Amino acid sequence: MFPFCDSSSPMDLPLYQQLQLSPSSPKTDQSSSFYCYPCSPPFAAADASFPLSYQIGSAAAADATPPQAVINSPDLPVQALMDHAPAPATELGACASGAEGSGASLDRAAAAARKDRHSKICTAGGMRDRRMRLSLDVARKFFALQDMLGFDKASKTVQWLLNTSKSAIQEIMADDASSECVEDGSSSLSVDGKHNPAEQLGGGGDQKPKGNCRGEGKKPAKASKAAATPKPPRKSANNAHQVPDKETRAKARERARERTKEKHRMRWVKLASAIDVEAAAASGPSDRPSSNNLSHHSSLSMNMPCAAAELEERERCSSALSNRSAGRMQEITGASDVVLGFGNGGGGYGDGGGNYYCQEQWELGGVVFQQNSRFY
């Protein structure tokens, strides 16, 4: 059985009393100590199938040996409970932050080196890269010239081109200097990077501003050219879409009316020609039309222009009425369907006489008006 608290066994004493250590010393770990109770959790977890009788026997054997003799024996080395003290958290954090900072700085330096591997130059337009990309045609011509000159670098070819065209560049610079005066007094640089000698006089060392040096004789030529070809006035954004005035709208309406009248006249002409063809086909080559039919046909042909004039008059009246009601001029879009029919009792031209009727259908302001008129 397990020992109880009231037993006189030395195993009932605390561990630090058994080892004769001071109470202020750190507490030892029971799982790693020499004396371990049989029922301790580390021992039981290590081997759950360990026989209980063997555990009790080993505890009794340990009781037979005094703990003082075991501790004081020279065979057992005395080891410290903690070989190395844990490092403070502040030192670990400082080391980690230092490592991260050094890594970030290296990454930034590497990124900067990858981003800008070539040095840039400062120009009037700001910082610019020394590299440039040529089009296909220009690149072919450029490298052909480089092969002819025998240069091994593109910079030498460009320098040769600049030296060759130095006179033309100086003329351009003189023209710019004559048109614009530099107020800050800063001297410009020539093609080869030195001070421009065009700004200095040959005899003396005093300089003049750019506005007073060469190129003054070209000013009148530019002025005369500008006076000869005046530029058209620029249209502002507000005048781009101007609303037409009343006269322009009235003229547009008048042109629309003329087009509508011409369309009606052409329609009447087509209808008259179609009627003549049908009448000739109905009469036949053997039957000659009588005098009544001829007079009827001639009167019908004479009535066609009258009907057209009447239609135009009605259109004019309807437009005037709509203008009065609306209070302003409106363009009337009308769609007229004219149906002409000729017939008699026998279904053609005969003694019964002819009947002519005109059916009109007008659309005014979304309302459809239908009117039938007959002419005998």
Curated annotation (Swiss-Prot):
Residues 207-219, 243-261 have a biased composition (Basic and acidic residues). Changing residue 48 to T: In strain: cv. D940Y and cv. M37W. Expressed in axillary inflorescence primordia, immature internodes below these primordia, and immature husk surrounding these primordia. Residues 290-299 have a biased composition (Low complexity). Changing residue 70 to A: In strain: cv. CML247. Residues 246-263 form the R domain. InterPro entries: CYC/TB1_R_domain, TF_TCP_subgr, Transcription_factor_TCP. One of its GO terms (cellular component) is nucleus. Changing residue 214 to C: In strain: cv. Chapalote. TB1 is a major QTL of the evolution from the teosinte to the maize morphology. Transcription factor. Involved in apical dominance. Represses the growth of axillary organs (e.g. lateral branches), but enables the formation of female inflorescences. Regulates the number and length of axillary branches. This is Transcription factor TEOSINTE BRANCHED 1. The gene is TB1.
